[in-house]
Amino acid sequence: MRIALGGFRIESCTFSPLLTREQDFQVLRGSPLLASYPFRSQYGDVEFVPLVEAAALPGGPVEKSFYERCKGEFLQGLQEQGPWDGVFLRMHGAVNVAGMDDAEGDLLAAIREAVGPAALIAASYDLHGNVSQRVMDCIDVLSAYRTAPHVDGAETIERACSLLVRCIREKIRPHKVFIPVPILLPGEKTSTEWEPAASLYRLIPGLIKGDAVLDASILIGYVWADEPRSTASVIALGTARDQVHHAAVTLAQRFWNVRHEFQFGVTAAPVDRCIHEALDAPERPVVISDSGDNPTAGGAGDVPYVLERMQALGVTDGVFASITDPEAAAICETAGPGAEVDLLLGGKLDPVHGKPLRVQGRVRSLCQQPWLLHRTGDAGVVNHMAVVDVQGIQVIITERRTPFHRLADFRNLGIEPRQHKIVVVKIGYLEPELKALAAKALLALSPGAVNQDITSLPFKRIQRPLVPFDPDMAWSPVAIGCGRKPQESRNARS
C-alpha cells in the first residue's frame, strides 16, 4: 500500500491588508515531512511517501504564485512517483488565495484528476475550516478537530490517516453526508471549553458505530473570510447510508437548536473597561486577550491600541505580548541591553486598524530564537526579539509574527508572567497554559482585522440568510449528496 503525504495549511483572514508570502510559510519535504508522522511505524505494510507540505501562521490571503508552485510540486510528485492507493493531506480548511475562492477545492480537484477515481483521498481539518461542495465531491475521508483550543491536533491527524488506511485495506469507499449549517460565529464564542459547544462535541463518539458510521465532524467554520463557502458544517461518513444520514442530521439539528446560546466564555468588554477591571482586581496576574489583533486568528499582530490604552490608564506593572515590528526589533538589537530607545512601534503591517505608537523605554533583554511554526520544521530562520521596559510595562517586540501561548515563550525572554499584575496577549480564547496562569481572564474587544464584532464587518460575499446576521431565520437540516459514489464493504449494514 502506497500513500502520498502533503498538505497546505493556513487560516486566511480576508479583512487583513497583509499578503501571506512564501517567506511566511514553513515547507516540509522528504524525511522532515515523514518524521512529522510518528505513528506511521504501526503500519508496517504501508509505504508513506512524503511529497510537500506548506504551513503558515494565520494571516491574510496567500500570494497566488506561491500556492500554484506548491500545488504544481505536489502534482508533479504524484505523477512521477505513482501509482497510489491513497493520498493523505494535513489541511486547515480556511485557505484564501488572492484572486481565488476555495483553494482547498481547487487543490483537491487537481489531486483527484491526477490520481484517478480508484485512489482514496483523506484529510485532517481544523474545526475552523470552511468546507465546500467541491471538496466533498473530491475527498473520501475528512475528519476535523474536536477541541478548541486545539489540543487534539495530533490525535485528529492520526485518526484521519488511520481511517484512510482502514478504508484502503477493507476496500471501503465511504458514503458521505455533508450538511452546511447557516451559522457563522467566532471561535471565542464556540470554544469546547464551555457550553454549548462542549456538549455538542460530546455527541460525536456516541454516533460512531464501526464501519456503519466511521467518523463524524462538526466544523464551526472560519468567520473572518468573506467567501460564499463561509459557514459551519457537519460531515458524517461510513458504509451504512441511513445511519450516516442519521448521524449528520442529528449533529446538525442539535447545532441549530443551540445557535443562540453561544457566548464568550469569559468577561468580554471594551479595552478600557478590561484594563480598569484588571487594575482593580485583588488577584494577579490578570490575563487580557487583545482579541481583535490576534495573529493566531489572522490578525497582523502589530496594532498597538491596547498598549496605548495601558499607558494612558496608568499601568505600571504589566507585560504586553507582543508587537511585530522588524524595524523596532533591529533598533533594540543595535542599541543593546540597558540602552534607552525611542521607537515608533507597530501600525505598519496593518495601518487600517492602527497607527504607529511612539514609546520610550529601556532595552531589558534581547533574544534570537529559531522561528518554528508549531515548533516543528526547519530551524534555519531566526526570529529576533526584544523586551523593552516602557514605564513598567514589559513590551515584547518580535521580528516575525509570533504567538505567545506557553509560559516558556515568556521565560525565554527573561519574563516570569506570574510576577506581573497584568499580562496582555494577542490571542482570543486562552490556550491551556495561559488559562492555568490567569487568576482572572478578560477578553478585550479591541480593534483589528479579526474584530469580534462580526456583524459590523464589511461582508459582501457570504451567503445569506446566516446566523447571527439573520437571527430569526428558519432552517432545517438538508443533507447534500457528494460526487463520489459510495462503495459498501462486505460487512456493511443499511
Predicted regions and their residues:
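N-terminal amphipathic/basic leader segments beginning at the initiator methionine
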Residues: 1-43, 52
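Cap/lid and interdomain-hinge subdomains that line or gate substrate/regulatory clefts
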Residues: 48, 58, 122, 129-223, ...
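Active-site histidine-anchored catalytic micro-motif
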Residues: 4, 8-11, 64-71, 81-172, ...
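Glycine-rich phosphate/diphosphate-binding loops that line cofactor/substrate pockets in enzymes
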Residues: 1, 43, 76-85, 274-286
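Short acidic, glycine/serine/threonine-rich loops at helix termini
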Residues: 15-19, 62, 99-101, 132-137, ...
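Hard-cation-handling environments
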Residues: 188-391, 396-400
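Extended hydrophobic packing segments that form well-structured cores
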Residues: 50, 72, 256, 370-493
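Low-complexity, highly charged intrinsically disordered N-terminal segments
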Residues: 46-49, 53-58, 62-77
